[in-house]
Design a protein with these regions (language model features):
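N-terminal Lys/Arg-rich, disordered targeting/topogenic segments
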Residues: 1-15
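Membrane interfacial helix-start segments of signal peptides and signal-anchor transmembrane helices
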Residues: 12-25
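Hydrophobic membrane-insertion alpha-helices, especially the h-region
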Residues: 22-35
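Hydrophobic single-pass membrane-insertion segments
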Residues: 33-46
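Electrostatic cytochrome c docking/interface patches
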Residues: 46-76, 168
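Periplasmic/extracellular electron-transfer cofactor-ligation site
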Residues: 68, 74-104, 129-137, 161-168
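Electron-transfer interface patches adjacent to heme c in soluble/periplasmic c-type cytochromes
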Residues: 104-122, 141-151
Length: 181
């Protein structure tokens, strides 16, 4: 058998394996995309419609987010917040480390941050009044630019990006701070 014929046979026997590997790779990518899409869709309405109990205190189910308010909140967030907090809510790098002026960089509003650790009323107040001078907060207040309802709408958009655990915890804090157990 000639050298050229051996090379031709080797290529022919490798072709099915390459097709199989390529097909499996494509299947894996499609599977990952489907899982990601499902998780993203579930995050937007990540509620169980069950009462939330933490530390023995039960509050009503997490309120469902209104898709129209979430869309409006995204528009407002993009206009007023994204320049500092990031288009994907990611915040600034090293947001936990003080800057030379003593302030902190803008924190993320996604699940990696601490926004979901605070009740709604406190978050709206921070948005309205700006960063706390006691912490060298440099975030401007938006009370002149936005109504309280617009600030709450932005918060609805932010919440739409959290998972069910963050939503439930933040709702529990909000409800208990309002005396709703």
């Amino acid at each position: 058998m000639t050298s050229a014929k051996r090379k031709s046979l080797a290529r022919q026997s490798a072709a099915p394996r390459l097709w199989l590997a390529g097909g499996l790779g494509l299947f894996g990518l499609l599977l990952l995309a489907a899982v990601y899409a499902t998780q993203t869709a579930n995050t937007a309405q990540a509620t169980t419609n069950q009462p939330v109990t933490l530390n023995g205190i039960t509050v009503p189910p997490v309120p469902t987010l209104d898709p129209a308010r979430v869309a409006s909140g995204e528009t407002l967030y993009t206009q007023y917040c994204a320049a500092c907090h990031g288009a994907d809510l990611q915040g600034a790098p090293n947001w936990k480390q003080r800057l030379p002026n003593g302030s902190f960089p803008p924190p993320p509003h996604d699940p990696t941050g601490h926004t979901w650790h605070h009740p709604d009323d406190q978050l709206v107040a921070i948005t309205a009044l700006g960063g706390d001078p006691a912490y060298n907060g440099v975030m401007p207040g938006f009370a002149v630019s936005l109504t309280t309802d617009q600030m709450a709408t932005i918060l609805d958009f932010i919440k739409s990006r959290w998972g069910s655990q963050e939503r439930e915890y933040q709702w529990w804090i909000t409800a208990t701070s309002r005396g709703q157990p």
